């Protein structure tokens, strides 16, 4: 078969995979069924509400939210350089662990950390893995060494109250490069550890956020990123032996240089950058050291959101963000043949390219959970490697969203995904608006277990990409910065008003929810537009920008001030803080948080709840003693989402 064409695996291969899928499904359900008491484990205080079954559709026809939360998923694939071995993560045990996909198709579990793995990196041959793991959601990850030949797991770098991250193997598989804030809580320096002797050497010492990105094939040069904010970074080439630093991306203003990879001869770097006239992130080939840039997909109107180059420099793969959908592209750089997998309608992500010309990636859609796929650039073969369980739920019940655009107060078009329950009769129904975090995140048509549950229970859902979202270029992402913060909250109101004006919902029967920055946006919308919303769910959200900046992890403060404004401007920060105006909130509020959250400290939840109660408002809280920035454990998610659906039913379905 010619290059650039796509061929699915045979029926026999699918049949074999189905056997593995059945085992995966059994393992996932068994792990959840035999988990300890979720209330006891979570440390949460929960008060029962009216059951969904008492009011909603026939409970025999619609599976419970607990069943929906047990639908599986796989992520973070990596492939050995020769393309022979694939690794991935899945939470079939209740938390994320690292697995190796054996040649028989069996997923072999490599790690068994109590609170799961945070990240991992496979060596070139696939014989060694470095894994980061933390406890209680603290994000203070220690490093562990996994020998895939012996299956032994041993400590590599253990430090109390220190965050390690961004591990990178040397080509000879002896050294691991990583970032750490062990010397000063606010600065990440770069270190090298000898996996044989355990000796550690600091090789990069600059204030702020620094991380190793890529290493040359001879092991002598390291590509380093220094981040000034979430929308601005600089790349350097470090000579490891001499310490000489060569700036690769000097610039003025806010620009991104991401996913950078070195060519084997060190003559060029491939990267994704928005340093161009229209501010759209695209793939560039940048000469070293002259700095001359050539854009490889310069004609594309869409943002490039991921890119990877094989270690031999022959194969390139990238993902283009087509209005929220992620389309995978792959190119043989030797003969120029390119493939576009646009028929896969959903989101491709987490790509990793081997020197054998294989691309492993995650694919999911609104109706299919995330699984690992492999594409062979040379042969055009496309294969699904994992088959996540649907927990016994009929996939045909799931609903795809419609991409719509509504106009905000100043004429700006706001893209959004509109979900309607099957058979919607054209009359107003209870609606939920879901606001993404970041704030530079983006709402995508990804698989959402609780979205599909709500749809089957008669809810509609609107997921907007308000100004400040990524995926639409440099100008759009900057529209909510600093003193423009409340313009993005107005975008949310205009979305709710659009639902009412078009007959989808009634004013006062629209719920709003969001996590992290989306939690702030939820609270701010309830403050500024109290009559149109009937319920709010704040998940690990910011309530007070002053206390948030004072108490967030030190290494995050400067990055966040670049977005929200300096702590010195406390008058403005307090004015846009929901806790300042808690008396305006009319809708019942559910606040969810993790006790160990290093990003948005739990004090944000407690002060917001206290402020609402002091003013006679209705507020309930759910604080997980063993979580951080979001509920990561299945046992806690079961508690959270049961509480969520009962809260929404109680306040939006009356």
Where are these regions (language model features)?
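Conserved beta-propeller blade repeats
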Residues: 71-89, 114-132, 143, 160-179, ...
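Active-site-proximal cap/loop segments of hydrolase catalytic domains
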Residues: 464-654
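Short beta-strand element of the alpha/beta-hydrolase
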Residues: 420, 427-437
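N-terminal cap/lid segment of alpha/beta-hydrolase-fold proteins
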Residues: 386-425
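Short amphipathic alpha-helix adjacent to the substrate-entry channel of hydrolases
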Residues: 445-464
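Bacterial N-terminal signal peptides
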Residues: 17-33
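N-terminal secretory signal peptides that target proteins for export/translocation
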Residues: 1-14
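Beta-propeller blade-edge and WD-like acidic-aromatic loop motif
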Residues: 46-62, 85, 89-109, 128, ...
């Amino acid at each position: 078969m010619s290059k650039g064409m796509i061929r699915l695996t045979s029926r026999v291969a699918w049949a074999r995979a189905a056997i593995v899928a059945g085992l995966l499904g059994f393992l996932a359900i068994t792990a959840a069924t035999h988990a300890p008491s979720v209330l006891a484990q979570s440390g949460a205080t929960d008060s029962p509400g009216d059951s969904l079954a008492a009011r909603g559709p026939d409970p025999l026809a619609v599976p419970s939210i607990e069943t929906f939360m047990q639908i599986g998923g796989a992520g973070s694939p990596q492939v050995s350089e020769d393309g022979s071995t694939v690794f991935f993560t899945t939470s079939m045990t209740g938390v994320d662990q690292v697995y190796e996909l054996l040649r028989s198709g069996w997923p072999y579990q490599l790690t068994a950390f109590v609170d799961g793995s945070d990240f991992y990196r496979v060596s070139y041959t696939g014989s060694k893995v470095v894994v980061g793991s933390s406890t209680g959601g603290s994000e203070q990850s220690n490093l562990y060494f996994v020998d895939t030949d012996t299956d032994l797991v041993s400590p590599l770098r253990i430090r109390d109250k220190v965050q390690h991250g961004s591990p990178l193997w040397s080509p000879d598989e002896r050294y691991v490069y990583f970032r750490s804030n062990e010397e000063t809580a606010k600065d990440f320096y770069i270190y090298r550890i000898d996996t044989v002797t355990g000796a550690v050497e600091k090789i990069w010492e600059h204030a702020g956020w620094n991380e190793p990105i890529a290493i040359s094939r001879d092991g002598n040069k390291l590509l380093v990123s220094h981040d000034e904010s979430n929308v601005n970074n600089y790349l350097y080439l470090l000579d490891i032996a001499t310490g000489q630093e060569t700036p690769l991306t000097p610039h003025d203003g806010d620009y991104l240089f991401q996913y950078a990879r070195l060519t084997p001869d060190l003559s060029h770097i491939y990267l994704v950058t928005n340093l161009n006239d229209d501010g759209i992130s695209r793939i560039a080939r940048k000469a070293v050291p002259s700095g001359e840039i050539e854009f490889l997909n310069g004609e594309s109107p869409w943002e490039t959101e991921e890119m990877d180059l094989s270690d031999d420099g022959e194969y390139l793969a990238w993902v283009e963000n087509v209005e929220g959908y992620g389309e995978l592209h792959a190119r043989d750089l030797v003969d120029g043949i390119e493939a576009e997998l646009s028929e896969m309608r959903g989101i491709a992500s987490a790509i990793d390219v081997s020197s054998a010309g294989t691309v492993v990636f995650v694919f999911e859609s609104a109706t299919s959970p995330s699984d690992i796929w492999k594409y062979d650039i040379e042969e055009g073969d496309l294969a699904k490697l994992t088959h996540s369980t649907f927990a016994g739920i009929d996939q045909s019940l799931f609903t795809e969203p419609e991409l719509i655009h509504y106009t905000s107060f100043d004429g700006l078009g706001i893209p959004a995904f509109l979900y309607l329950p099957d058979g919607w009769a054209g009359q107003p129904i209870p609606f939920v608006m879901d606001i993404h975090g970041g704030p530079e995140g983006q709402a995508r048509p990804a698989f959402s277990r609780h979205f599909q549950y709500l749809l089957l229970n008669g809810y509609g859902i609107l997921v907007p990409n308000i100004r400040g979202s990524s995926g639409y270029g440099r100008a759009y992402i900057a529209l909510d910065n600093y003193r423009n913060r409340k313009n993005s909250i107005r975008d949310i109101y205009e979305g709710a008003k659009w639902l009412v004006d078009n007959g989808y919902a009634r004013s006062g029967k629209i719920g709003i929810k969001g996590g992290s920055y989306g939690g702030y946006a939820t609270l701010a919308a309830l403050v500024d537009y109290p009559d149109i919303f009937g319920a709010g769910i704040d998940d690990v959200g910011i309530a007070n920008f002053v206390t948030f900046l004072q108490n967030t992890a030190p290494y995050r403060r400067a990055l966040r001030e670049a977005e929200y404004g300096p702590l010195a401007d406390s008058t403005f920060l307090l004015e846009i803080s929901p806790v300042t105006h808690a008396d305006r909130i009319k809708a019942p509020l559910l606040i969810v948080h993790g006790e160990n959250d290093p990003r948005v400290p739990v004090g944000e939840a407690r002060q917001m709840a206290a402020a609402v109660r002091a003013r006679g408002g209705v507020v309930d809280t759910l604080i997980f003693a063993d979580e951080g920035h979001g509920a990561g454990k299945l046992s806690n998610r079961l508690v959270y989402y049961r509480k969520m659906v009962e809260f929404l039913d109680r306040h939006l379905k009356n």
